């Protein structure tokens, strides 16, 4: 964290923010990729785990919890199965991180010019976070859809797409442009409040958490306060909007390939409200929160790594530019 508890909007040039955001996204994605695959598999599973008769006729795998799912994937698909969809996901996280942090910084700077009628700091952070998340999600959504489809497909002869370029060609040919944006409304509807809540909470906790390493009875690495603030903010925000995340995943695998993924019994859904209503009627409220545990397990370290890496990368970029200026 920056000295003096600066807000994110006050730090770095536009180029530095883009680079730091991209680096943070790249590293964060690689670290949490296995948990992302597990989350997607659990979210696409429609049968009840508490009722064995509901999956008596299921031909695909039955996943029961995070550790069980990891073991099943390792046994049936090998270690690489836990990194399925990582290429589009890495592209997604790099682009998303750069766009998100740039939009956040730009929006907060624009809002700061409203003096003497400035909004309260938490509201500024919420608006900036919501805009950053919404714009980044819409701009990178095709990569998000590809990430989900690759994570949901089987191995060997059961693969739906052979490569990233093959998936782009096949979706464009069989589903058209609209195929790349299935579930986009649910994604934006989820990410806007999520990122608004995340950044508002993060900015509020950041100055408080900055003193945590100094007060700790054991030595903590630099940036621990940033990581802790990211964890708390992520868990609180993720829980509130999780049903829309699940709806997004169900919609992303619709289309002509719907019955070809690991879960071959995915129902046909039409629209956000239709999907949410059908899940609630057939699986209850619990069905809308399927995969929440692994999602929180994933979101906490992902946000911690993202914010820690972003702060460290931005600091290094700023120091490098200052040093380069002195040498000129």
UniProtKB/Swiss-Prot annotation:
Solcar repeats lie at residues 12-110, 120-208, 221-316. Keywords: Membrane, Mitochondrion, Mitochondrion inner membrane, Repeat, Transmembrane, Transmembrane helix, Transport. PROSITE patterns: SOLCAR. Gene3D superfamilies: Mitochondrial carrier domain (1.50.40.10). GO terms for molecular function: thiamine transmembrane transporter activity. GO terms for cellular component: mitochondrial inner membrane. InterPro entries: Mit_carrier, Mitochondrial_sb/sol_carrier, Mt_carrier_dom_sf. Its main location: mitochondrion. GO terms for biological process: thiamine pyrophosphate transmembrane transport. It is a multi-pass membrane protein. SUPFAM superfamilies: Mitochondrial carrier (SSF103506). The chain crosses the membrane at residues 17-37, 79-99, 126-146, 185-205, 227-247, 291-308. It is found in: Mitochondrion inner membrane. Mitochondrial transporter that mediates uptake of thiamine pyrophosphate (ThPP) into mitochondria. Belongs to the mitochondrial carrier (TC 2.A.29) family. PANTHER family: SOLUTE CARRIER FAMILY 25 (PTHR24089). This is Mitochondrial thiamine pyrophosphate carrier 1.
């Amino acid at each position: 964290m920056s000295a003096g508890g600066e807000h994110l909007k006050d730090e770095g040039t536009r180029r530095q923010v883009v680079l730091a955001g991209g680096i943070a996204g790249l590293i964060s994605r690689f670290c949490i990729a296995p948990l992302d695959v597990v989350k997607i598999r659990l979210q696409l599973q429609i049968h009840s785990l508490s009722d064995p008769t509901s999956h008596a006729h299921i031909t695909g795998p039955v996943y029961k919890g995070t550790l069980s799912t990891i073991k099943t994937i390792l046994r049936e698909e090998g270690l690489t199965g836990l990194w399925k969809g990582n290429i589009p996901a890495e592209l997604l996280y790099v682009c998303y991180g750069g766009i998100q942090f740039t939009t956040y910084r730009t929006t907060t700077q624009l809002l700061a010019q409203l003096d003497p009628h400035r909004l309260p700091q938490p509201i500024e952070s919420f608006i900036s976070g919501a805009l950053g998340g919404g714009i980044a999600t819409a701009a990178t959504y095709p990569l998000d859809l590809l990430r989900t489809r690759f994570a949901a497909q089987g191995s060997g002869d059961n693969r739906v797409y052979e490569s990233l370029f093959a998936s782009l060609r096949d979706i464009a040919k069989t589903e058209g442009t609209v195929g790349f944006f299935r579930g986009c409304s649910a994604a934006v509807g989820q990410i806007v409040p999520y990122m608004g809540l995340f950044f508002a909470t993060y900015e509020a906790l950041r100055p408080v958490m900055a003193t945590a390493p100094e007060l700790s009875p054991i030595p903590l690495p630099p940036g621990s306060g940033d990581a802790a603030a990211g964890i708390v903010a992520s868990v609180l925000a993720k829980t509130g909007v999780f049903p829309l995340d699940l709806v997004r995943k169900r919609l992303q695998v619709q289309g002509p390939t719907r019955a070809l993924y690991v879960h071959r019994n995915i129902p046909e859904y039409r629209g956000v409200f239709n999907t949410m209503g059908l899940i609630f009627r057939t699986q209850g409220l619990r069905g809308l929160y399927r995969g929440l545990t692994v999602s929180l397990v994933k979101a906490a370290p992902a946000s911690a790594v993202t914010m820690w890496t972003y702060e460290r990368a931005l600091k290094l970029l700023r120091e490098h530019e200052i040093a380069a200026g002195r040498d000129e």
